[in-house]
Amino acid sequence: MMTNLFSVFDPSTTILNLSLNWLSTFLGLFLIPVSYWLMPNRFQVIWNNILLTLHKEFKTLLGPSGHNGSTLMFISLFSLIMFNNFLGLFPYIFTSTSHLTLTLALAFPLWLSFMLYGWINHTQHMFAHLVPQGTPPVLMPFMVCIETISNVIRPGTLAVRLTANMIAGHLLLTLLGNTGPMASNYLILSLILTTQIALLVLESAVAIIQSYVFAVLSTLYSSEVN
């Protein structure tokens, strides 16, 4: 049972000893170029409005010290994560964002680059962040330790939050899907089906929210080092 339950997270599809499941990470790239040679439809108009809204919000979070075009990185990050979250809801498509391999690969380099930029170019500003304003002198050494630890675990919390949310929803859907064939009557089967549809809608919302949270927190971490 446990093997079947977690088999959806196992990248085991191979051809010539090459794992193919991770190629699903780039499936979203095949959907984007189509908009450049087709007439705009409602989906493209909505998507462009979403990107413009995100650009304005990220620009506000970065403040006047943000470089021109810096929001493009965070919008691309949001798009990549959201595409992978949504594609993982389709049958037989591997959910790459349910693995720390991908989420840590996104979170750690971003955090490390922000820290290197901040400590090299704004050293005094970074030291000032270690002691919140109004801290009593007696508590300053403890606050430095606490702030340092909270700063170091940021990439881990970013990665684990996204991974845990993706795993939890998929496990619930898998559990309900496995109990469907064992349903004794149509009433229980219809109840399971209704619950699965509700969970699928909820997972769609989680896919958007978690990609938005990941991008917004990355933007906030970037704004702190300026």
Curated annotation (Swiss-Prot):
InterPro entries: ATP_synth_F0_asu, ATP_synth_F0_asu_AS, ATP_synth_F0_asu_bact/mt, F0_ATP_A_sf
UniProt key word Acyltransferase: no
Compartment(s): Mitochondrion inner membrane
Keywords associated with the record: ATP synthesis, CF(0), Hydrogen ion transport, Ion transport, Membrane, Mitochondrion, Mitochondrion inner membrane, Transmembrane, Transmembrane helix, Transport
Membrane topology, from the record: Multi-pass membrane protein
Protein family (similarity comment): Belongs to the ATPase A chain family.
The protein's name in its UniProt record: ATP synthase subunit a
Lineage: Eukaryota, Metazoa, Ecdysozoa, Arthropoda, Hexapoda
Gene name of the encoded protein: mt:ATPase6
